[in-house]
Design a protein with these regions (language model features):
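Conserved active-site and cofactor/substrate-binding residues in soluble primary-metabolism enzymes
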Residues: 15, 19, 35, 39, ...
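Catalytic alpha/beta active-site cores
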Residues: 57-240, 244
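Catalytic-core signal marking the mid-to-C-terminal active-site face
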Residues: 10-23, 31, 36-43, 57, ...
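Flexible, glycine/charged-enriched surface loops at secondary-structure junctions
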Residues: 34-41, 52-54, 131, 191-193, ...
Length: 479
């Protein structure tokens, strides 16, 4: 996985941080946070917090006391130890797109299927730059709703040997994911000692944690599995239009969820989540890759470090309907501040289209290229006698060229990043090769990767036990 040792880009002054601190404290004490779960309300009552109906009015010092119990950094194991990940510090881990109900393949936009889910999972396995296939890479609408989480989890566990994300639609789905993890890794003790999944728990912003998300949180936290407590903020819709107000709300929501996770299981690993963008004030549509979202992302990194927490943000986000120039520049507008801020867990790193409604096969490849280039750009320079190349100057002298110099010949294969997607051909050669644009080249690449895909090995007995579990649970769920 990638370690980003570049300096973090911090934009908030000490005075600004103090103002934000006052803001979130006032929100949790005067407005409060709704928890649509009696179990959660009872935990807060027992901890001495003021509860009125479903609203908890939190003591900020109590919140910080709970947050301090969460680890600053932690490990997550994959079934292939080479793909274990570290969350926190300089580490950055990247996962594929999450949640779209539709897919785009070429000119066709359609409902996602289980076959699409499997193919995206296979693509995620085939690129080393991705540390995880994610979770719901796309929503397989051709499978029964009550049991499709079983098929998705089985695919993630068998078609990749990387870290996977847990299903969070309900507590039942979470229990199934945990049970399958126990099969894959050898029991409850094994997954509690070193967690095996990461699960996304979204806040129903503004200031409400709903029952389904909380049911899943209770299951995963009790099992010691990391959860990403994520305020879902589109400024102008789920938060006020100003970035400072959105940041204050984000802190209040994230820390209140993290506090609950620590009440469920003290020391449970958590990630400070952030999904922060804005709407088009003329149409009301969500917009992505905006300057405001990038600035909010930079602020979020600084805020999370202030609280001693790893954080999730960023991704190759775009509002574009197709893998065009807009899709590329908006994705970069989000991914560049992701690196500048040093986000530790990055969802939606490959495949996001149309505001998250669509998983795009060609866009997946474009995003992988962007991600590979950024990792190369954020790798520190090695400056030593060899890299200063004084001998090359002695060899070439004045007015010559370095193409044939020994220093060049020793390094020409690896001295520069070699793009898999970009074209640097002259116009005539590009036309002779069909005049194919980036989307067309991306199509060839993903098709080739799928043809060359090799499924990672898995013990036959473990595979059989997983498959038997899926069959049994599907029958119990009535599907």
């Amino acid at each position: 996985m990638f370690r980003n040792t570049m300096p973090r880009y911090e934009v908030l002054s000490a005075d600004a941080m103090a103002q934000l601190d006052k803001g979130w404290r006032r929100l949790v004490t005067e407005i409060g946070v709704e928890f649509m779960s009696e179990k959660a309300l009872e935990l807060f009552r027992s901890a001495g917090q003021k509860v009125e109906e479903n609203t908890v009015f939190l003591d900020p010092d109590f919140v910080l006391e709970q947050v301090a119990k969460a680890p600053r950094e932690f490990d997550v194991q994959a079934r292939n130890p080479a793909h274990n990940i570290h969350i926190g510090g300089d580490s950055m881990a990247f996962g594929s797109v999450y949640g779209p109900p539709f897919v785009r393949e070429g000119e066709v936009r359609r409902d996602a299927t289980m076959d699409d889910f499997r193919r995206f999972t296979m693509l995620s396995q085939s690129f080393d730059v991705l540390d995880s296939a994610g979770g719901v890479i796309c929503e397989p609408n051709d499978t029964p709703l009550d049991s499709r989480h079983l098929d998705m989890t089985l695919a993630l566990m068998t078609l990749t040997d990387k870290v996977y994300m847990g299903n969070v639609v309900s507590g039942v789905n979470a229990r199934d994911t945990i049970a399958m993890g126990e099969i894959l890794f050898g029991g409850r003790a094994a997954i509690e000692e070193t967690p095996v999944s990461i699960s996304l728990i979204n806040c129903n912003s503004p200031l409400r944690w709903d029952d389904r998300m909380l049911d899943a949180l209770f299951e995963y936290a009790a099992a010691g599995q990391p959860c990403v407590l994520t305020p879902f903020l589109l400024m102008g819709a789920m938060s006020p239009v100003t970035i400072p107000a959105a940041l204050v709300q984000q802190i209040a929501e994230a820390l209140s969820g993290i506090a609950l996770a620590q009440l469920i299981r003290p020391g449970c690993p958590v990630i400070f989540g952030s999904f922060l963008s804005n709407i088009d004030m003329q149409s009301g549509s969500p917009t992505f890759g905006t300057p405001e979202s990038g600035l909010g992302l930079l602020c979020t990194g600084q805020i999370a470090r202030h609280f001693g927490l790893p954080f999730r943000s960023g991704g190759a986000l775009t509002s574009s309907q197709v893998p065009d120039a807009q899709a590329g520049y908006e994705a970069l507008m989000t991914m560049l501040p992701t690196f500048l801020a040093g986000a530790n867990w990055v969802m939606h790193s490959a495949g996001w289209l149309e505001g998250g409604l669509v998983a795009g096969f060609e866009k997946f490849i474009v995003d992988v290229e962007i991600l590979q280039m950024l990792q190369a750009e954020f790798t520190p320079l090695e400056i030593d006698e060899a890299s200063l190349a004084f001998d090359a100057h002695q060899e070439v002298g004045h007015g010559g060229h370095f193409l044939g110099a020994m220093h060049t010949m020793e390094r020409f294969r690896t001295c520069f990043y070699r793009p898999m997607l970009s074209s640097s051909e002259n116009y005539e050669r590009w036309m002779r090769n069909g005049g194919v644009d980036a989307a067309g080249r991306a199509k060839k690449i993903y098709q080739q990767r799928l043809e060359e895909y090799e499924q990672p090995t898995l013990d036959d007995a473990v595979r059989q036990e997983l498959e038997e579990y899926v069959v049994r649970r599907r029958a119990e769920l009535g599907d």
